[in-house]
Amino acid sequence: MSVKKEIFGIHPSGKEVYKFEIVNKQGMKAVITNFGAILISLFVKDKKGNFQDVVLGYDSLEEYLDNHPMFGATVGRNVNRISNAKFELDGKTYLLDKNRGNHNIHSDKEHGFHKVIWDFEITGENSVCLSYLSCDMEQGFPGEVYIKMTYTLTETNGLILSYFATPNKRTILNVTNHTYFNLGENIFSTEFCIHAKSFTPVDEDIIPTGEIREVKNTPMDLTKYSYIGDRLNSNYHQLQIEKGYDHNYVLDHPHTGFRLIAQTRSMKSGIHMDVYSDMPGMQFYTSNSLKNTIGKNGVVYKKYDAFCMEPDYFPNAINTKGFEKPIFDSNKNFISTTMYQFY
């Protein structure tokens, strides 16, 4: 096991940006940059013994400076949607960037966690710890927040993402990673299983309605391994809104801590991925908005070429009655762990 550091590029501010390669004894390799705490590449062995890069991304720092799809991004302070780009906390109204119609998505797509240079520390032969101090009212959110995000590659082919954030006063924190996975060709050759009996339906703006609906007898039911290609053309309204999945699943056993929440496998490559988390929800997204984006090695990424599995608190939870609020303060840190296990 080893960690290699090298310069990835020069930021417009003049600062050097680095990338880190972590390789285990099986040859699995994770490539991370301290710009945006982004996962650039993840090389996993397929059924033929060859290593495939199973995540979408770019070749250069310059391309990540834009990164509209948010490939591999650490998203914060708040992932997903906030209706009308505002929320109330302790009697005060906070206004956010209206970056998706009248609403807010992923906090600030131009100045979020994925667009800043993080400090770094190589904390062992298999992990890199990235840290960032977010100032009071940055992105429109109250409170100063010091966050650490650690990538760890295990000898058993697991990639662990650990988050620890400390605010100095009450604020919203809902941090996740926005990696696009491609285990083999596209989502049509991949089977999915999500350990959730319910999901949160959305309106035409992809804002949860507040309902928690059972997946049973709907195309949203992924409680058993399923191919989803034929479902994308169904007349089920929730899938017609964006012509794909972009929904929060209400995970089973939400208060039992770190647990298996989802599984995927590609018969084409033979690669399996299990997802573990301690979060109550997970956003499942089938790259509905990808439009001929040129990525690594000149590959053109198209709609449905990849999927995201983003453990988190429910979208728009701060504004929705009955949803657990992602509110933290100096006496309550944001702590979360996600693991992507490959075999």
Give the label of every model feature segment.
Residues 1-343:
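An exposed, glycine/acidic-rich loop-and-rim segment of catalytic or binding clefts
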